[in-house]
Curated annotation (Swiss-Prot):
This is Protein translocase subunit SecA. The lineage of its organism: Bacteria, Bacillati, Bacillota, Tissierellia, Tissierellales. The keyword Protein transport applies. InterPro entries: Helicase_ATP-bd, P-loop_NTPase, SEC_C_motif, SecA, SecA_CS, SecA_DEAD, SecA_motor_DEAD, SecA_preprotein_X-link_dom. May bind 1 zinc ion per subunit. Its EC number is 7.4.2.8. It is an enzyme of class 7 (translocase). It catalyses: ATP + H2O + cellular proteinSide 1 = ADP + phosphate + cellular proteinSide 2. PANTHER family: CHLOROPLAST PROTEIN-TRANSPORTING ATPASE, SECA INNER MEMBRANE COMPONENT OF SEC PROTEIN SECRETION SYSTEM. It holds the Pfam family SecA_DEAD. The keyword Zinc applies. It comes from Finegoldia magna (strain ATCC 29328 / DSM 20472 / WAL 2508) (Peptostreptococcus magnus).
Length: 909
């Protein structure tokens, strides 16, 4: 049985047993593949495509196709997929999640299902978390696919539409979740079909699937246009909020209104709920607000906008912490990702919160933007025909993957047994005692030379610990959002002998910590000191060949330095192995067990030894907010000395319960987000389908004729309700009809001879006569294009307004819960009514536009709004700028592609 005997849950064992015969079949081709020439191996791709055309399925050809990729990987990269990697490949092909530990070679695994599914000709998207990894994997693994005759593309920030279209047309495309999502939204804003860049959503392989489909699931992708609202109110609301007094709610208090019932004599103006990160006015505060802003009733619907500004100012000042939730850099507010600790370049908080923080910090307040298009990652990725993913940590969230995405998780055995020892948590009575214990632990371990990686959950904690280590004379590196430029370098060297590294959660997804150090980074650092430019250094380890003499010479220097440092790091690694590998210290438990497991997983890769331990205090946020009565009882007892750890099974259980409680809460929040977005998603599909009909050049004439009939019928139903024609509201009806039917078209002298039905038929007939005459005057073909142009313009304008209206509805809908009404159901019902109103409004404006159109020489489609920003993830807005010497036509391109400037970014200059 081999690896299949690894200890997994019985359900997981069953899944692995089912896959075992497939793995044996793949391995049975090994010898025959080795005997093929390169050309014969490449020809297998042609053969597979032919077999698919003749009726075989992807499952039929899987064993042989995987064997082909395995052999090609060895010939091209010198790497051959292990047995456990073959298991991972099968799981991915089946549309499931492969949980593979850090260092098990997930990148190489993805080549197997990517190749197999690309044979169908429908495209495969490999999804990574940043542009660097997308480019690296395209150049690295792409060589295997290209060797086998497939085309490989990459989608990164800065490509124009033609380049994007070309890369999406490839058999396999690498890119980030943000790039794929934004391109989907932009494709549904284009006014000509030829401007679309994507070609359908067939199969996606998502790397770090938990990060993308869970951690980022609450953040919608938003494409915005510039709003025109004044920013003065943010400043006024901030000044008002700064003059108030408040208190933090006890974790057991449920709702702010309890305060006003039970603490009438208190005079605080607002309450802060740390659990939910919200702040709200009390009755006392509400009266102050009404007096300050000169309004009679803050709860009046006319004052909804003012109340919203006040709430956001309270939230900004009392729940959003500088250097934890965001940093201030160059007079800008930059968001810090709570899961990774990275700065999220280009992203802004929505709903006015970003502006409220700008007002709080005294930087320029930028006006709110208008949403042009939006989608959540949940609904974007559920549109793929097949979805799969890989990560080192997914099992704890299996229920969510199953419920939301219909994907189960299969734990893949490690190639070598995990040798890392995960020690029992050390729990202290308060934070000071905990940090003192951490420093003492680091001092003791540091004496042995064992490398230490200390994981923190915020910039604030990392800097506090750094100051303590400085006082104790311990040399160390600090990695947090303020030093994110050096992230890869610091993480890569964290495994060196005698090294101490403090890192926020950003600690290295995508960058392996190699015991003994990373010779690649050492060689590059040396070359920087020698004066080589950034663009040359970025191209050194490109997998693309180059004919540029300067770059070839630089690569030769790099190879020599790499050999030198490899020898040094190999010796260093021996010393690290002797002292037990990398020691991981967690400074507190994260809300999610998965994030804790990710930190632990930095140590013990590929069978290396290692250790991990978490230090916890009863004052940590997790324990304070979610620990419950058990933790509170211990914290208030006063029985325990500060300098000794508390070793009680009840505390360990309380930590586990707290994490489970938070994970459950967060799952509930994400499910709730999805319930709301599902309403928008259904509407989005209708609009995008109608847009596609226009873009595909469909004849919209019958649709517009139907609109004319609907508009007239609805108008007559509204104004002619009485059975007797003399009681009809003819003046109002004619005022309405004359907005599109010219005056004098209708003969009303015989009105008494009509009933409502015959009158409706008469008005429709006369309207269509006018419409057909207009078509004849303009010409049929030109008139058909005018119909498409006007319909597209009206749909886009109305849809963008509707997105904002639905967003406002959602912001206010939560209050319905106080009236015993299900907010989601209310949102669904009212959203449907608003959607129907929008559809009616689209018909009215389209009909008016068509009746009032004048003969023109040329009719041109125009976008109703232009994108100013795309937010929702790590959008790499600041492209590197090369200063100093002008780039020559034959110089290496500064983008790092390895090509000459004239053949890359300079080809259109």
């Amino acid at each position: 049985m081999g690896v299949f005997e690894s200890i997994f849950g019985s359900a997981n064992k069953k899944e692995l047993k089912k896959i075992e015969p497939i793995i044996k079949k793949i391995e049975s081709y090994d010898k025959s593949m080795q005997q093929l020439s390169d050309d014969e191996l490449k020809h297998k791709t042609v053969e597979f495509k032919e077999r698919l055309k003749n009726g075989e399925t992807l499952d039929d050809i899987l064993p042989e196709a995987f064997a082909v990729v395995r052999e090609a990987s060895y010939r091209v990269l010198g790497m051959k997929q292990y047995r456990v990697q073959l298991i991972g490949g099968v799981v991915l092909h089946q549309g499931r999640i492969a949980e593979m530990k850090t260092g098990e070679g997930k990148t190489l695994v993805a080549t197997l299902p990517a190749y197999l599914n690309a044979l169908s000709g429908k495209g495969v998207h490999v999804v990574t978390v940043n542009d660097y990894l997308a480019k690296r994997d395209k150049e690295w693994m792409g060589k295997v696919h290209e060797f086998l005759g497939l085309t490989v593309g990459v989608i990164v920030y800065g490509l124009d539409n033609d380049e994007r279209r070309e890369n999406y047309a490839c058999d396999i495309t690498y890119g980030t979740n943000n790039q794929y999502g934004f391109d989907y939204l932009r494709d549904n804003m284009v006014i000509y079909k030829k401007d679309k860049v994507q070609r359908g959503l067939n199969f996606a392989i998502v790397d770090e699937v938990d990060s993308i489909l869970i951690d980022e699931a609450r953040t919608p992708l938003i494409i915005s246009g510039q709003g025109d609202e004044s920013t003065d109110m943010y400043m006024r609301a901030n000044m008002f909020a700064n003059g108030l007094t408040g208190r933090i709610m006890d974790p057991e208090e449920d709702k702010p209104d309890i305060f006003d019932r039970e603490f009438k004599d208190e005079t605080v103006d607002f309450l802060v709920d740390e659990k939910r990160k919200t702040a709200s006015l009390t009755e006392v505060g509400t009266r102050k607000a009404e007096e300050y802003f000169g309004v009679e009733n803050l709860s009046d619907p006319n004052n909804m906008e003012l109340a919203h500004h006040i709430n956001q100012a309270l939230k900004a000042n009392n729940t959003m912490k500088r250097d934890i939730d965001y940093v201030v850099k160059d007079d800008e507010i930059l968001i810090v990702d709570e899961f990774t600790g990275r700065i999220m370049e280009g992203r802004r908080y929505s709903d006015g919160l970003h502006q409220a923080i700008e007002a709080k910090e005294g930087v320029e307040v930028k006006s709110e933007s208008k949403t042009l298009a939006t989608v959540t990652f949940q609904n974007y990725f559920r549109m793929y025909n097949k979805l799969s993913g890989m990560t080192g940590t997914a099992k704890t969230e299996e229920a969510e993957f199953n419920e939301i995405y219909k994907m189960d998780v299969v734990e893949i055995p490690t190639n070598k047994p995990v040798a890392r020892v995960d020690e029992q948590d050390r729990v202290y009575i308060n934070e000071n005692a905990k940090f003192n214990a951490i420093v003492e632990e680091i001092k003791e371990i540091h004496k042995t030379g064992q490398p230490i990686l200390v994981g923190t959950i915020s910039i604030e904690v990392s800097e506090r610990l750094s100051n303590l280590l400085k006082k104790n004379g311990i040399k160390h590196d600090v990695l947090n959002a303020k030093q994110h430029e050096r992230e890869a370098e610091i993480v890569a060297q964290a495994g060196m002998f005698d090294k101490v590294t403090i890192a926020t959660n950003m600690a290295g997804r995508g960058t392996d910590i190699l015991l003994g150090g990373n010779p690649d980074f050492m060689a590059k650092h040396d070359m920087k000191k020698q004066g080589y430019g950034d663009y040359v250094i970025e191209s050194l380890d490109s997998f693309l060949p180059s004919t540029d003499e300067e770059l070839v010479a630089a690569r030769n220097v790099y190879n020599e330095l790499h050999k030198k440092y490899k020898k040094m790091t190999d010796e260093n690694k021996k010393k690290v192995l002797e002292v037990g590998g990398l020691y991981i210290i967690g400074t507190e438990r994260h809300e999610s067990r998965r994030i804790d497991n990710q930190l632990r997983g930095r140590s013990g890769r590929q069978g290396d030894p290692g250790r991990s331990r978490f230090f916890v205090s009863l004052g940590d946020n997790l324990m304070r907010l979610f620990g419950g009565e058990t933790i509170q009882k211990y914290a208030e007892s006063g029985k325990f000395p500060e300098d000794e750890p508390m070793e009680f099974r009840t505390i360990t259980k309380a930590i586990e319960r707290a994490q489970t409680k938070v994970e459950s809460n967060n799952f509930g929040i994400r499910k709730n987000v999805l319930k709301y977005d599902d309403v928008m998603n259904a509407q989005r599909k209708v609009i995008y389908t109608e847009r596609d009909k226009v873009l595909d050049g469909e004849d919209m004439h019958e649709s517009i004729v139907a609109m004319i009939k609907d508009i007239i019928s609805n108008a007559i139903d509204t104004y002619c309700q009485d059975p007797k024609s003399e009681n009809w509201e003819m003046e109002a009806l004619m005022t309405y009809l004359n907005t599109f039917i010219p005056e004098g078209t209708l003969d009303l002298t015989r009105l008494n001879s009509y009933n409502k039905k015959t009158f409706t038929d008469y008005v429709i007939q006369k309207a269509l006569e006018v419409y057909n005459a207009k078509e004849e005057a303009i010409g049929k073909e030109k008139f058909r294009e005018i119909e498409r142009v006007i319909l597209l313009m009206v749909v886009d304008r109305k849809w963008m307004d509707h997105i904002d209206a639905m967003d406002q509805l959602r912001q206010g809908i939560g209050l319905r819960a106080f009236g015993q009404q299900d907010p989601v159901r209310a949102y669904n019902n009212e959203g449907f009514e608003m959607f129907e109103d929008m559809n009616h409004s689209i018909k009215e404006d389209t009909v008016r536009g068509m009746f009032n159109v004048q003969p023109v020489e040329e009719i041109e489609r125009k976008q109703v709004a232009h994108e100013t920003s795309a937010t929702g993830g790590e959008e790499e807005i600041n492209k590197p700028v090369v200063k100093g010497k002008k780039i020559g036509r034959n110089d290496p391109c500064p983008c790092g592609s390895g090509k000459k400037y004239k053949n890359c970014c300079g080809k259109n200059r």
